[in-house]
C-alpha cells in the first residue's frame, strides 16, 4: 500500500472522491464535513451545519454539488463553490446512513435507520420514491452505475436489489398523460415505481455494505458475520457465488476496484484487505494499530482508494503506476502488463518484445520496479519487489519480434536492486551485508565487493561504477578501484537520471531535485512543493522534469520554471529538441511538443550566447512581466529593454542598464518631475553633463542648474540664470549666481535692492568699491556699520574655468558585455543593418571585458580542477594496502614447476594450414609458400617469368597478417587475417587468407585503362592493362560465374595489351610507312570497345589515306561508318569513301587482307590467317607464329608460349 | 594480484595505464602517497617498465642501482637486454644465474622478465620453465601470449581461465581474453572487439586500444574502419610501430599505397617483425624463383 495522504481528525464516517479534481470529502462523526486537496495536502473548506455525526457524503459527477446525510435526519445539498448549503431534504425519520447522487438523473438515493430507502429529486427538491421492505436499519444504498437498479444492505441480514425502471420511465416521459394518471395513482399508494427484484440472503448477521460491480452483474457485500460475500445476478435471479473469509470483526465496507480485478474491504478489525476477485483469495492485508475502519471509497477514474477510520482517513494506492523503463540510444524498453515492450523514438514504433510473466499470475505489487538494459548483449534486468526484492535476467532473442507467448526461463535472484554496470556485468545489491555481487550473464558471481556505506539501492553511474543510495546521502563507488569517487548529502533519492554524456546527474527525491557533476559535486538544488515524478536531460544540458501536474525545466545554474501544466502525471523518458517523450500511467508512449523558447533563451543568456539571445528576441514572441523580472533580477536590464513597451518600465530599465539615450526618450514621453530628477542623477553619475543640464532645465531646478554651470565653468549660462533669477525675483538665487560669477557689483546691487544696506555697504567697502560704499554710507547715514577690525579681507572669486561646457569623460557603464554582444550579433547576423552606430573604441573595451570574464572563469575552472586533483590525491593515502594472500601462494606452486611441467610442442601456425589446404596460388603466396605458389602457377598457366609478379607476391604475403601488441615489451603477435568472416563463423576453424587483391579492384583498373586509352595515354593504359594481366593469376573469386568473368577479363585485357603494344610500336616506326599502315590496320582487328575501335579505325584510315592506299582507307572508312560515329568522324569517313570511289587503288602493298579473318602474332605482329599454324600463350591466350614456341609470351610477359597448362584456377569453387 | 580484498587499490590506475599502453600517463601519475613498501616496489617496476616500453632503456639502467630490490634489478636486466642486443649473451647468462639462485629465483617479477627475455629469444621451452606456474596476473597474461605465439590456443585458454577465476574484470584478464579471441578467430573476434570497445569507453584512447580495435576490424574484413582507427592512432603517436605495421597491411587491403608507412617503419623500427618479414619474403621470392626455374 502506498499512502498518498493522511489526515488526523475525528472518526471519519463518509468519504467521496471528486471525479475530476484532486479532492476528497470526509464527513466526520463530529458533524463536520471536510474538503481536502489530497495532492497538495491542504484543507480547502469545511462545512459545519449538521448536528451530530455525518455518515454519508457524495460529490455530484458534473455539477459543483455534493450531498450529505446525518444523524439529524437531514439530507443537505451543498454548493462547494459558494461554500453553502443550498437546501435540506427532510423526510427520513431516523439516522441517515448513506447518500448518493444518480450519475444521470437529478436523483439522490438515501438509506436510513428508519428501514427505508428514499429517492429524491434534487431539482424539484422532493422525495420521488420510498423503498420499503427492509425490516431493520438500512446501512447502505446505491444506484447501479448503468442500469435502473439500486442495491441496499440492511441489518436484517439481507441485501436487496431494487428495480427502479418504472421510476425512470416516469421521469423520462413525464408528458405522457395516461402514464401520469396511473403514476399518480401509484404515487398515492407508493412502492410501485421501485420494486424489490432480488433479496439476497446468506449473511448470518446484519449486512453493513453492498456494492455493484462497475461493469459485470456482480454484487459484493460485507456484514457483521465478518464475511464478504460475492453474488451474481442475471435477468431472473441472483445467487451467492462465494464467501471471502478473513476479517476478524465486522466488515464495514467493501467494493470492487474500478480498474483491477480485485475486491477491497475494510473492517472494524483495523485492517484493509485486498482480495483477488477471480480466485477469491486474499492478496494483501494492511493493518492499523488502533483505528477501526468504517468506510471505503474508490476513485471513479484513477487508481486511488480512501479509507476512513477512528482518527482520520488515508488516501492510498495499491501499487505503483510508474512503468519501469530503460533508455538506450534511440530506443526505450519498458514493461507493460506482462510484456516487455520496445519503443523506437525516431519512428515512434512500438512493439512487444518478450513476455515476462505468465498470463493469470497475480499482478498486484509484483510489477517491475526498475529495468536495466545492456545494448550489446541485448539483455534486460527486471527488478521487482517480489520476495522482498528480486531480479530477473532476460536475454532478448536476436529476432526479437517474438510474437510468441512463451515465457523465457529467466535467470533469477534476490537482491535489493540489480543494474548493469558493463556490457556483460551486472551488480546486485545484497542489503543485509551491504555488499554488491557482480555477476555475469550466466548469473554467476564474478566478484563480491563491500560497499562503503550502508546502501539500500544502487544505480548505474558509468561503466564499472555504482551510485549507492542510503537514507541521507549518495556516493559513487568505483567497483574496480574500490574507491569512493564522490559523495553528496541528499534527501532520500528515488530516481537517478544521467545526462547523455554522463557528465551530469540529476538526483530526484520526493520534493527535491539535485543536479550534480559526475563526481557528485553539487551544482544546484531545487525544491518543489509537489511530488517530483520524472525527468530527462535535453541536448543542451537543461534538465526537464515533471511534477504531478507540471512539466518544468531546470537550467544548469538552478533557475527553474514551468513549461506547461499536466492533467495527469507522466513519466518523461527522453527529451529531443522540442519534443518530450513520455510514458503515461497506462504504459502508453506519448510525444509532447513543448515550447522550449523560454528556457533556451535563459540558457543562452546564462551561457553568454548573445547572438542567440538577440536572434531569439528578434524572432519570437518572448515577453511578459515574468521574463522582464527575470532579466532584471539576473542583471540583464538591457535585454529586458527590448521587450518593454510601457514607458515607465522602460525608463526604469534604461536607468538600471545605464542606457541614457533610451532613458531620455522615455523621460520626455513621461515628462514627470521625478523621472527627470532620476535621469539627472544617473546622467550626473555617468558624467553626461549635457543630459544633466537638460534634466535640470526640464524640472526648472535652477539651483542645481546654477551649481552645474559653476562646476562646468559655463559662465554665460550662469549669468543668464542670474538674469532669470532677477526676472523671477528670486533674490537668493540671484545672489548665489552673482557669488558664483564673482560679480561683486552685482552682489552689492542685489543686497541694496533687497534692502540689506549695511551688508551692501560692507561688501562694497571690503571690495574697495569706494564710490558705491560712499553712496551707501550716505544713504545709511548714522547707521554705517563698522568694518571688522584686524582681519585681512580676501577676494572671494571662483577660479576662472580653463575650459567650459561639454561632457566629462563618460563613465563606462555596465553597458559593457551585452551591448557589445548584441551589436556584434547585429553586424554578424544582418548585413543590411549598417546603421548600428559602431564605436570601435568602445567595442574594443567590451571585448576586453569579455576576455576578462572568460579569463576569470578559466582561472576559476582551473582552480576547481586543481582542487579536484588535490582531493583525489588526498583520497589515495587513506590506508595501506592489505596485500592479497595470493602473493604468497605462487611460491609453493613455483617450487614444483620445473619438475612436473613439460612444455607442449608448438602448434601449427595458421599460414601453414593455409599452405597445406590450398591449391590456389594466391593463397599460397599469402601463406609465404612462394615456391608452391610458383609451381602452381607454372602448372596451371605455364608461367615461367615470375619477376613481374614479385610485388604481388610480397603484397599478398605482407597483407596476410595484422600485428597485435599484447604484453608490454614482448614480441608482438602476428595474427592471420582470414577471408569471409561472418558473425557466425566458428572459432578455431581456419578460413583461407584474406587477400589484398580482389576482382572489383581489377574492374576499377579496367575502367581507368579504358579512360587512358580514350584520352590517348597509351603508355599509361598499357601499364594499367598489364598490371591487370599480372594480377589476375593471384586473384581469388568465390563463384563459378566470377571465374568465367575473370577468364573473359583476361581475353579483353589481352586484346588491349596487344593492340596498344602495336600502336606504340607503330609510333616508333616513323620511317617505315608500310609497317605503320600494317600495324594501324592490325590494331583495328583487336577486340576493342566501340569508341576505341572507332579511334583505331580513324587513325588507320588517316594513315592509309595519307599513304594513298585509298582502297584500304575506304575500307576503314566504311567500317567506321558502321559503328555510327559522331558527325565529324562520319563526315571525314564519307569524304574518304568518296575520294576512294574515284580511285580504288592502293599505292603500296600491305600484308593485310581484311576479307580473310586473321589474328595477330603477339610478338612479330604479323597476321596469322585462318588455317595457318600457330601457337598460343597458355595464360593470356595470345597467338603466335609457330617459331615463337618456348619463348616468354610478349603480351603478358609471364607464361611460356605453347607450354602445357591445366588452366586458370582462381576459385575454391573450381577445386571442390 | 587483486583478489577480493577490501580497501582501495591504490595502484589500480597505474597498472591500468601500463597495461593499456598509456605509458606516459602511467609515468606522470606515479606519485602516489602512502604506499606500503611492497606497493612502492611494484609502482617503481611499473614505472620503469613503462620507460622500457617507451624505449628509454638507458634511463632505466642508470636509475636502478645495485641496492634496488630484486624486482627492479630484473626490470633493469630487461632494459639491458633490449638496449644492447649485441651483449645479450651476458645478460642472459646473468639472468640464468639469478634464476638459479634459490633466494631470488622465485621472484615473480624476475620470472616475468625471464619469460619476456626468453620469448624474445623464441626459446619457449625456457620461457615456460619459469612462467608456467603463474602466480601473478602478469605472469598468467604472459603465459596466454606465449601459448598464442606457440599456436596452442587450448593451453592459452587454460591460463585465461585461471585469470578469470582470480578476477574476471581485471584489465589483464580482459586483454588476455581479447588476445585469445583474436587468435582463435571466428565469432570470437566480435567479443575481442567489444572488449577493446569497452576499454575505449572506460579509459582514454591509447594506440594500443586503437590498434586492438583496428586488428579486430581487419580480422572481420572491415578494412575501411580499421584504416580510420589506425589513422587516429597515428595522430596520437606517429612512430608507434604497430600502428605503422598495421597501416601497411590495411593500406594493402584497401588498395592504397603502403610504401610510405613501410619506409617509415623501416626507418624507426628496423627490428620490427613486419620489416623482417618483408626482407625475408624478398629473399624467399628469389630463392623460390631459383627453385622453380
From Swiss-Prot, chain A:
<feature type="repeat" description="WD 2">
    <location>
        <begin position="49"/>
        <end position="88"/>
    </location>
</feature>
<keyword id="KW-0963">Cytoplasm</keyword>
<feature type="repeat" description="WD 5">
    <location>
        <begin position="202"/>
        <end position="241"/>
    </location>
</feature>
<keyword id="KW-0677">Repeat</keyword>
<keyword id="KW-0853">WD repeat</keyword>
<dbReference type="InterPro" id="IPR050844">
    <property type="entry name" value="Coatomer_complex_subunit"/>
</dbReference>
<dbReference type="InterPro" id="IPR047312">
    <property type="entry name" value="Coatomer_alpha_WD-assoc_reg"/>
</dbReference>
<dbReference type="InterPro" id="IPR019775">
    <property type="entry name" value="WD40_repeat_CS"/>
</dbReference>
<dbReference type="InterPro" id="IPR006692">
    <property type="entry name" value="Beta-prop_COPA/B_2nd"/>
</dbReference>
<dbReference type="InterPro" id="IPR016391">
    <property type="entry name" value="Coatomer_asu"/>
</dbReference>
<dbReference type="GO" id="GO:0005634">
    <property type="term" value="C:nucleus"/>
</dbReference>
<dbReference type="Pfam" id="PF00400">
    <property type="entry name" value="WD40"/>
</dbReference>
<dbReference type="InterPro" id="IPR015943">
    <property type="entry name" value="WD40/YVTN_repeat-like_dom_sf"/>
</dbReference>
<keyword id="KW-0472">Membrane</keyword>
<feature type="repeat" description="WD 6">
    <location>
        <begin position="246"/>
        <end position="285"/>
    </location>
</feature>
<dbReference type="InterPro" id="IPR056176">
    <property type="entry name" value="TPR_COPA_B"/>
</dbReference>
<dbReference type="Pfam" id="PF23953">
    <property type="entry name" value="TPR_COPA_B"/>
</dbReference>
<feature type="repeat" description="WD 7">
    <location>
        <begin position="288"/>
        <end position="326"/>
    </location>
</feature>
<dbReference type="Pfam" id="PF04053">
    <property type="entry name" value="B-prop_COPA_B_2nd"/>
</dbReference>
<keyword id="KW-0813">Transport</keyword>
<dbReference type="InterPro" id="IPR001680">
    <property type="entry name" value="WD40_rpt"/>
</dbReference>
<dbReference type="GO" id="GO:0005886">
    <property type="term" value="C:plasma membrane"/>
</dbReference>
Swiss-Prot record, chain B:
<dbReference type="GO" id="GO:0000139">
    <property type="term" value="C:Golgi membrane"/>
</dbReference>
<dbReference type="GO" id="GO:0005198">
    <property type="term" value="F:structural molecule activity"/>
</dbReference>
<protein>
    <recommendedName>
        <fullName>Coatomer subunit epsilon-2</fullName>
    </recommendedName>
</protein>
<keyword id="KW-0333">Golgi apparatus</keyword>
<keyword id="KW-0813">Transport</keyword>
<keyword id="KW-0653">Protein transport</keyword>
<dbReference type="Pfam" id="PF04733">
    <property type="entry name" value="Coatomer_E"/>
</dbReference>
<dbReference type="InterPro" id="IPR011990">
    <property type="entry name" value="TPR-like_helical_dom_sf"/>
</dbReference>
<dbReference type="InterPro" id="IPR006822">
    <property type="entry name" value="Coatomer_esu"/>
</dbReference>
<dbReference type="GO" id="GO:0006890">
    <property type="term" value="P:retrograde vesicle-mediated transport, Golgi to endoplasmic reticulum"/>
</dbReference>
<comment type="subunit">
    <text>Oligomeric complex that consists of at least the alpha, beta, beta', gamma, delta, epsilon and zeta subunits.</text>
</comment>
<dbReference type="GO" id="GO:0030663">
    <property type="term" value="C:COPI-coated vesicle membrane"/>
</dbReference>
<dbReference type="GO" id="GO:0015031">
    <property type="term" value="P:protein transport"/>
</dbReference>
<keyword id="KW-0963">Cytoplasm</keyword>
<keyword id="KW-0968">Cytoplasmic vesicle</keyword>
<keyword id="KW-0931">ER-Golgi transport</keyword>
<keyword id="KW-0472">Membrane</keyword>
<comment type="function">
    <text>The coatomer is a cytosolic protein complex that binds to dilysine motifs and reversibly associates with Golgi non-clathrin-coated vesicles, which further mediate biosynthetic protein transport from the ER, via the Golgi up to the trans Golgi network. The coatomer complex is required for budding from Golgi membranes, and is essential for the retrograde Golgi-to-ER transport of dilysine-tagged proteins.</text>
</comment>
<comment type="similarity">
    <text>Belongs to the COPE family.</text>
</comment>
Amino acid at each position: 500500500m502506498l499512502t498518498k495522504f493522511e489526515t488526523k481528525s475525528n472518526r471519519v464516517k463518509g468519504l467521496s472522491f471528486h471525479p475530476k479534481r484532486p479532492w476528497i470529502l470526509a464527513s466526520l462523526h463530529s458533524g463536520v464535513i471536510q474538503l481536502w486537496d489530497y495532492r497538495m495536502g491542504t484543507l480547502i473548506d469545511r462545512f459545519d451545519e449538521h448536528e451530530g455525526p455525518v455518515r454519508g457524503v457524495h460529490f455530484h459527477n458534473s455539477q459543483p454539488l455534493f450531498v450529505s446525510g446525518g444523524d439529524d435526519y437531514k439530507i443537505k445539498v451543498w454548493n462547494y463553490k459558494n461554500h453553502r448549503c443550498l437546501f435540506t431534504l427532510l423526510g427520513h425519520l431516523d439516522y441517515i446512513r448513506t447518500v448518493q447522487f444518480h450519475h444521470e438523473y437529478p436523483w439522490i438515493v438515501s438509506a436510513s435507520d428508519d428501514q427505508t430507502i428514499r429517492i429524491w429529486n434534487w431539482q424539484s427538491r422532493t422525495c420521488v420514491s420510498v423503498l420499503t421492505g427492509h425490516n431493520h436499519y438500512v446501512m447502505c444504498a446505491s444506484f447501479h452505475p448503468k442500469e435502473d437498479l439500486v442495491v441496499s444492505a440492511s441489518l436484517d441480514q439481507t441485501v436487496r436489489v431494487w428495480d427502479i425502471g418504472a421510476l425512470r420511465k416516469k421521469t423520462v416521459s413525464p408528458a405522457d398523460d395516461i402514464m401520469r394518471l396511473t403514476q399518480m395513482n401509484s404515487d398515492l399508494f407508493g412502492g410501485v415505481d421501485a420494486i424489490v427484484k432480488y433479496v439476497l440472503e446468506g449473511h448470518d448477521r446484519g449486512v453493513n455494505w453492498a456494492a455493484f460491480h462497475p461493469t459485470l452483474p456482480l454484487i459484493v457485500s460485507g456484514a457483521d458475520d465478518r464475511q464478504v460475500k460475492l453474488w451474481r445476478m442475471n435477468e431472473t435471479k441472483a445467487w451467492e457465488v462465494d464467501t471471502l473469509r478473513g476479517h476478524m470483526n465486522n466488515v464495514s465496507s467493501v467494493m470492487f476496484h474500478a480498474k483491477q480485478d480485485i475486491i477491497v474491504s475494510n473492517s472494524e478489525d483495523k485492517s484493509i484487505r485486498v482480495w483477488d476477485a477471480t480466485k477469491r483469495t486474499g492478496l494483501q492485508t494492511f493493518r492499523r494499530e488502533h483505528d477501526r475502519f468504517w468506510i471505503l471509497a474508490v476513485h471513479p477514474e484513477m487508481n486511488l482508494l480512501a479509507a476512513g477510520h477512528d482518527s482520520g482517513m488515508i488516501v492510498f494506492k495499491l501499487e505503483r503506476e510508474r512503468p519501469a523503463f530503460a533508455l538506450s540510444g534511440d530506443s526505450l524498453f519498458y514493461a507493460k502488463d506482462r510484456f516487455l515492450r520496445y519503443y523506437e523514438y525516431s519512428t515512434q514504433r512500438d512493439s512487444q518484445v518478450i513476455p515476462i510473466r505468465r498470463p493469470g499470475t497475480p499482478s498486484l505489487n509484483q510489477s517491475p520496479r526498475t529495468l536495466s538494459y545492456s545494448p550489446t548483449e541485448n539483455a534486460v534486468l527486471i527488478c521487482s519487489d517480489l520476495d522482498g526484492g528480486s531480479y530477473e535476467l532476460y536475454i532478448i532473442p536476436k529476432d526479437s519480434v517474438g510474437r510468441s507467448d512463451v515465457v523465457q526461463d529467466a535467470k533469477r535472484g534476490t537482491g535489493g536492486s540489480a543494474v548493469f554496470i558493463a556490457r556483460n556485468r551486472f551488480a546486485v545489491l545484497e542489503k543485509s551485508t551491504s555488499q554488491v555481487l557482480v555477476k555475469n550473464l550466466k548469473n554467476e558471481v564474478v566478484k563480491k565487493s563491500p560497499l562503503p556505506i550502508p546502501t539500500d539501492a544502487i544505480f548505474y553511474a558509468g561503466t564499472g561504477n555504482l551510485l549507492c543510495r542510503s537514507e541521507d546521502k549518495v556516493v559513487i563507488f568505483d567497483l574496480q578501484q574500490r574507491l569512493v569517487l564522490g559523495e553528496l548529502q541528499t534527501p532520500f533519492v528515488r530516481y537517478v537520471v544521467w545526462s547523455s554524456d554522463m557528465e551530469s546527474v540529476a538526483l530526484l527525491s520526493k520534493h527535491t531535485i539535485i543536479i550534480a557533476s559526475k563526481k557528485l559535486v553539487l551544482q544546484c538544488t531545487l525544491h518543489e512543493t509537489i511530488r517530483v515524478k520524472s525527468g530527462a536531460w535535453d541536448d543542451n544540458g537543461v534538465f526537464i522534469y515533471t511534477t504531478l501536474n507540471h512539466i518544468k525545466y531546470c537550467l544548469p545554474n538552478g533557475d527553474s520554471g514551468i513549461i506547461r501544466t499536466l492533467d495527469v502525471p507522466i513519466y518523461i523518458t527522453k527529451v529531443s529538441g522540442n519534443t518530450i517523450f513520455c510514458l503515461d500511467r497506462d504504459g502508453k508512449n506519448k510525444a509532447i511538443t513543448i515550447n522550449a523558447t523560454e528556457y533556451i533563451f535563459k540558457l543562452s543568456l546564462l551561457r553568454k550566447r548573445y547572438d542567440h539571445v538577440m536572434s531569439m528576441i528578434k524572432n519570437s514572441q518572448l515577453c511578459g512581466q515574468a521574463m522582464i523580472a527575470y532579466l532584471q533580477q539576473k542583471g540583464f536590464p538591457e535585454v529586458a529593454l527590448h521587450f518593454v513597451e510601457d514607458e515607465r518600465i522602460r525608463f526604469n530599465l534604461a536607468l538600471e542598464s545605464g542606457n541614457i539615450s533610451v532613458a531620455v526618450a522615455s523621460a520626455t514621453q513621461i515628462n514627470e518631475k521625478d523621472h527627470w530628477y532620476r535621469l539627472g542623477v544617473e546622467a550626473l553619475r555617468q558624467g553626461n553633463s549635457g543630459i544633466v543640464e537638460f534634466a535640470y532645465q526640464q524640472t526648472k531646478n535652477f539651483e542645481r542648474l546654477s551649481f552645474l554651470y559653476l562646476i562646468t565653468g559655463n559662465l554665460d549660462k550662469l549669468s543668464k540664470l542670474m538674469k532669470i533669477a532677477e526676472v523671477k525675483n528670486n533674490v537668493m538665487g540671484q545672489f548665489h549666481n552673482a557669488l558664483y560669477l564673482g560679480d561683486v557689483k552685482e552682489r552689492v546691487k542685489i543686497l541694496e535692492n533687497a534692502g540689506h544696506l549695511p551688508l551692501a555697504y560692507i561688501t562694497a567697502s571690503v571690495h574697495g568699491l569706494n564710490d558705491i560704499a560712499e553712496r551707501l554710507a550716505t544713504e545709511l547715514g548714522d547707521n554705517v556699520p563698522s568694518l571688522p577690525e584686524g582681519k585681512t579681507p580676501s577676494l572671494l572669486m571662483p577660479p576662472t574655468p580653463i575650459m567650459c561646457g561639454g561632457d566629462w569623460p563618460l563613465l563606462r557603464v555596465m553597458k559593457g558585455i551585452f551591448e557589445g554582444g548584441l551589436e556584434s550579433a547585429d553586424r554578424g547576423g544582418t548585413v543590411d543593418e549598417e546603421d548600428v552606430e559602431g564605436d570601435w573604441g568602445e567595442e574594443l573595451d567590451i571585448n576586453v571585458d569579455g576576455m576578462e570574464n572568460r579569463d576569470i572563469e578559466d582561472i576559476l575552472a582551473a582552480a576547481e580542477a586543481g582542487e579536484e586533483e588535490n582531493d583525489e590525491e588526498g583520497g589515495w593515502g587513506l590506508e595501506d594496502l592489505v596485500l592479497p594472500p595470493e602473493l604468497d601462494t605462487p611460491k609453493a606452486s613455483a617450487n614444483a614447476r620445473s619438475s612436473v611441467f613439460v612444455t607442449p610442442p608448438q602448434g601449427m601456425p595458421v599460414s601453414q594450414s593455409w599452405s597445406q589446404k590450398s591449391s590456389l596460388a594466391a593463397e599460397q603466396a599469402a601463406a609465404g609458400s612462394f615456391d608452391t605458389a610458383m609451381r602452381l602457377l607454372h602448372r596451371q598457366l605455364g608461367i615461367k617469368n615470375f619477376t613481374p609478379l614479385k610485388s604481388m607476391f610480397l603484397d599478398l604475403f605482407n597483407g596476410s597478417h595484422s600485428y597485435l601488441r599484447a604484453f608490454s615489451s614482448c614480441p608482438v603477435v602476428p595474427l592471420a587475417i582470414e577471408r569471409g568472416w561472418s558473425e557466425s563463423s566458428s572459432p578455431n576453424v581456419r578460413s583461407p587468407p584474406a587477400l589484398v587483391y580482389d576482382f572489383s579492384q581489377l574492374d576499377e583498373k579496367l575502367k581507368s585503362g579504358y579512360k587512358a586509352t580514350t584520352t590517348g595515354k597509351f603508355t599509361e593504359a598499357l601499364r594499367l592493362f598489364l598490371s591487370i594481366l599480372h594480377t589476375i593469376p593471384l586473384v581469388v573469386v568465390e563463384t563459378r560465374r566470377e571465374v568465367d568473368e575473370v577468364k573473359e577479363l583476361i581475353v579483353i585485357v589481352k586484346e588491349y595489351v596487344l593492340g596498344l603494344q602495336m600502336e606504340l610500336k607503330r609510333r616508333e616506326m616513323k620511317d617505315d610507312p608500310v609497317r605503320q599502315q600494317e600495324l594501324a590496320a592490325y590494331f583495328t582487328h583487336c577486340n576493342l570497345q566501340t569508341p576505341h575501335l572507332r579511334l583505331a579505325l580513324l587513325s588507320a584510315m588517316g594513315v592509309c589515306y595519307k599513304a594513298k592506299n585509298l582502297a584500304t582507307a575506304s575500307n576503314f572508312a566504311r567500317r567506321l561508318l558502321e559503328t555510327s560515329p559522331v558527325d565529324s568522324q562520319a563526315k571525314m569517313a564519307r569524304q574518304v569513301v568518296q575520294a576512294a570511289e574515284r580511285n580504288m587503288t592502293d599505292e603500296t602493298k600491305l600484308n593485310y587482307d581484311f576479307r580473310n579473318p586473321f589474328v595477330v602474332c603477339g610478338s612479330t605482329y604479323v597476321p596469322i590467317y585462318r588455317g595457318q599454324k600457330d601457337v598460343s600463350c597458355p595464360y593470356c591466350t595470345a597467338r603466335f607464329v609457330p617459331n615463337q614456341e618456348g619463348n616468354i609470351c610478349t603480351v603478358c610477359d609471364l607464361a611460356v608460349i605453347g607450354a602445357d597448362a591445366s588452366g586458370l584456377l582462381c576459385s575454391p569453387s573450381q577445386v571442390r | 594480484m587483486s583478489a577480493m580484498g577490501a580497501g582501495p587499490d591504490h595502484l589500480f590506475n597505474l597498472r591500468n595505464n601500463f597495461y593499456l599502453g598509456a605509458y606516459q600517463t602511467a609515468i606522470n601519475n606515479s606519485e602516489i602517497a602512502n604506499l606500503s613498501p611492497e606497493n612502492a616496489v611494484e609502482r617503481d617496476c611499473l614505472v620503469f617498465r613503462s620507460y622500457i616500453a617507451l624505449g628509454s632503456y638507458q634511463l632505466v639502467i642508470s636509475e636502478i642501482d645495485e641496492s634496488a630490490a630484486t624486482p627492479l634489478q630484473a626490470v633493469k636486466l630487461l632494459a639491458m637486454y633490449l638496449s644492447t642486443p649485441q651483449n645479450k649473451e651476458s645478460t642472459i647468462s646473468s639472468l640464468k644465474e639469478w634464476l638459479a639462485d634459490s633466494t631470488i629465483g622465485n621472484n615473480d617479477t624476475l620470472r616475468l622478465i625471464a619469460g619476456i627475455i626468453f620469448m624474445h629469444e623464441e626459446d619457449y621451452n625456457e620461457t615456460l620453465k619459469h612462467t608456467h606456474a603463474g602466480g601473478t596476473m602478469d605472469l598468467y597474461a604472459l603465459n596466454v601470449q606465449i601459448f598464442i605465439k606457440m599456436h596452442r590456443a587450448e593451453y592459452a585458454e587454460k591460463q585465461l581461465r585461471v585469470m578469470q577465476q582470480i578476477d574476471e574484470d581485471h584489465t589483464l584478464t580482459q586483454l588476455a581474453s581479447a588476445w585469445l579471441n583474436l587468435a582463435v578467430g571466428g565469432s570470437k573476434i566480435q567479443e575481442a572487439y567489444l572488449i577493446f570497445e569497452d576499454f575505449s569507453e572506460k579509459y582514454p584512447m591509447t594506440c594500443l586500444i586503437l590498434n586492438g580495435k583496428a586488428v579486430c576490424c581487419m580480422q572481420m574484413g572491415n578494412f575501411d574502419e580499421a584504416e580510420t582507427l589506425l589513422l587516429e592512432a597515428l595522430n596520437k603517436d606517429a612512430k608507434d610501430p604497430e600502428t605503422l605495421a598495421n597501416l601497411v597491411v590495411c593500406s594493402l587491403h584497401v588498395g592504397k599505397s603502403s610504401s610510405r608507412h613501410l619506409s617509415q617503419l623501416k626507418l624507426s623500427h628496423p627490428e620490427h617483425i613486419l620489416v623482417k618479414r618483408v626482407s625475408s619474403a624478398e629473399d624467399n621470392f628469389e630463392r623460390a624463383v631459383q627453385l622453380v626455374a
